[in-house]
Amino acid sequence: MKHTSRFRCAWVGATALVLVLASNGALPPGYQGKPFRDSVYGAGAQVIPGRIECAYYDLGGEGVAYHDTDATNHGSGELNLKPQHQRPHSNSYVWGFRSEEGVDISYTKDFADFNHTNFVAPATNQLYIGWTDNGEWCNYTVNVKKAGTYKIVALYGNAANRITFSINHQPVSECQLPLATGSMHIWNKAQIGTITFSEAGLQLLTFHYNKGNNFAYFDFEPVAANK
């Protein structure tokens, strides 16, 4: 099946980017990744509208489901092996999450994320992608339940970077994180743009990020016209 898509984008205000994509509602031909699932999370493809957890990127490994600049998981596979980072409010599933894969994942901890004031406080044990570097990306198979326009709301820490989304391998330009929080572990939650899916169905969402942030999740919320 031939896959075609087209998009347009425009700036709205100072910080938000409108992303408009027309798609045939199918995954790209030949894509070998699979929606994340394990013994705890068995739901499969994450759903839009809803929350896309950054740590639940697809299964498939380096070059298929993600690209990382090195093979070490500097959170679950390195930092969290130290006893002081295995917090009593957590468990081995959380501190060791996807430890054998290259994407750097950790979780929110009492002494790192809750010993100060956040702009928006994350949940305890919230998984996140950290140790980010330029050129890294993760793929997410998403199930778009209803065509239309959605706000993108990010929970993130640190730099006011630009991040890029692609859908079905088609670049959709950049979104601007609106506020530099001052630390990887000072968190903010804010709308960074909107995205329009012209059709429902499975889509491949690729999140491209740059050096200097922690990313927990993206909420995709229907705008009023969709509801």
Please place each PLM-identified region on the residue numbering.
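Bacterial N-terminal signal peptides
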Residues: 12-22
